[in-house]
Swiss-Prot record:
GO cellular component, one term: high-density lipoprotein particle
Glycosylation sites: 50, 253, 270, 324
Cofactors required: Ca(2+)
Quaternary data: Homodimer. Interacts with CLU.
Official protein name in the record: Serum paraoxonase/arylesterase 1
Note: The preferential association of PON1 with HDL is mediated in part by its signal peptide, by binding phospholipids directly, rather than binding apo AI. The retained signal peptide may allow transfer of the protein between phospholipid surfaces.
GO MF annotation terms: acyl-L-homoserine-lactone lactonohydrolase activity; antioxidant activity; aryldialkylphosphatase activity; arylesterase activity; calcium ion binding
Cited Gene3D superfamilies: TolB, C-terminal domain
Keyword Hydrolase annotated: yes
Keyword terms, alphabetized: Antioxidant, Calcium, Disulfide bond, Glycoprotein, HDL, Hydrolase, Metal-binding, Secreted, Signal
Taxonomic lineage from the root: Eukaryota, Metazoa, Chordata, Craniata, Vertebrata
């Protein structure tokens, strides 16, 4: 009887292991290879070598870029150097990056580790930049005021909250108001690792304001990018390891109601929204295994999706760019401005391309 019990337990354990292995391979898309999709004129951005994880382009063509992210389990080519915020003027013929100086007596530059970013412009045209920061592997949101003439950021405030335990990305909806994705439920790195590998789908989205903080969506397998429609009525959330983008209706009281989901054959990361057309531009990881288990001989590929008419019954999804990692490794974000596209990566370079007429 004891042997039968042991054999049964062994069989259940092996079945569980096989099921978990199969689930892991599916979630990380380990067998995916990309079919190249080229654009007519692409150039690597000089001065970006250690990541450009998120970016946002203002209506006037100024682009903010978060650079130098150190994320647990992800490659970093310069792990001891603090991160920074870069600026590009996309109106220039050959735009270059400029590091924005950061002022503010209480801000610690030495531990700056920027992740997702978002901007908010008020009625007086003051631009506020919100930056997800991971000082010493913690999660904060840093609020800055952009000083265009000085080419600097004035640090205004550091935001911490128990419902912001593992922030990945944010979308600003006011000067101190935002939605934030938490890519994990746990804070401890060991528990985070188990959470991700077991596919617990415990990550969630938080609404934050100075007087009201609450969970507004949950049950995600690594909630990642988040953005909002130009009219402010819909919120888009990328679920990285489920390969989905969710559309939520936003209500006047800031609650979110699920509307629809789109499935993809790629790991969807950050979402940019064209303010004119409403199209979504999504930085993606075709094969997640190569991001989380880096091999320089077999680097992670890059892929950019364009989603048109996402609210319709049949949204149009186009691969705008795809490359096997020879040029650009680990794309996380893409945004467009006047026929040009800027693509960022989690730990590698950035690419600036002309869009073809088909796009």
């Amino acid at each position: 009887m004891a042997k039968l019990t042991a054999l049964t337990l062994l069989g259940l354990g092996l079945a569980l292991f096989d099921g978990q292995k199969s689930s892991f391979q599916t979630r990380f898309n380990v067998h995916r290879e990309v079919t190249p999709v080229e654009l007519p004129n692409c150039n690597l951005v000089k001065g970006i070598d250690n990541g450009s994880e998120d970016l946002e382009i203002l209506p006037n063509g100024l682009a903010f870029i978060s650079a130098g992210l150190k994320y647990p389990g992800i490659m970093s080519f310069d792990p001891d150097k603090p991160g920074k915020i870069l600026l590009m003027d996309l109106n220039e013929k050959d735009p270059v990056v400029l590091e924005l100086s950061i002022t503010g007596s209480t801000f610690d530059l030495s531990s700056f580790n920027p992740h997702g970013i978002s901007t908010f412009t008020d009625e007086d045209n003051i631009v506020y930049l919100m930056v997800v920061n991971h000082p010493d592997s913690k999660s904060t949101v840093e609020l800055f005021k952009f000083q265009e003439k000085e080419k600097s950021l004035l640090h205004l405030k550091t935001i911490r909250h128990k419902l912001l335990p593992s922030v990945n990305d944010i979308v600003a909806v006011g000067p101190e108001h935002f939605y934030a994705t938490n890519d994990h439920y746990f804070i401890d790195p060991y528990l985070k690792s188990w959470e991700m590998h077991l596919g617990l789908a415990w990550s969630f989205v938080t609404y934050y304001s100075p007087n009201d903080v609450r969970v507004v969506a949950e049950g995600f397998d690594f909630a990642n990018g988040i953005n909002i429609s130009p009219d402010g009525k819909y919120v888009y959330i990328a679920e990285l390891l489920a390969h989905k983008i969710h559309v939520y209706e936003k209500h006047a009281n800031w609650t979110l109601t699920p509307l629809k989901s789109l499935d993809f054959n790629t790991l969807v990361d950050n979402i940019s929204v064209d303010p004119v057309t409403g199209d979504l531009w999504v930085g993606c990881h075709p094969n997640g295994m190569r991001i989380f288990y880096y091999d320089p001989k077999n680097p992670p590929a890059s892929e950019v999706l364009r989603i048109q008419d996402i609210l319709s019954k049949e949204p149009k999804v186009t691969v705008a760019y795809a490359e096997n990692g020879t040029v650009l490794q680990g794309s996380t974000v893409a945004a467009v401005y006047k026929g040009k596209m800027l693509v960022g990566t989690v730990f590698h370079k950035a690419l600036y391309c002309e869009l073809s007429q088909a796009n």
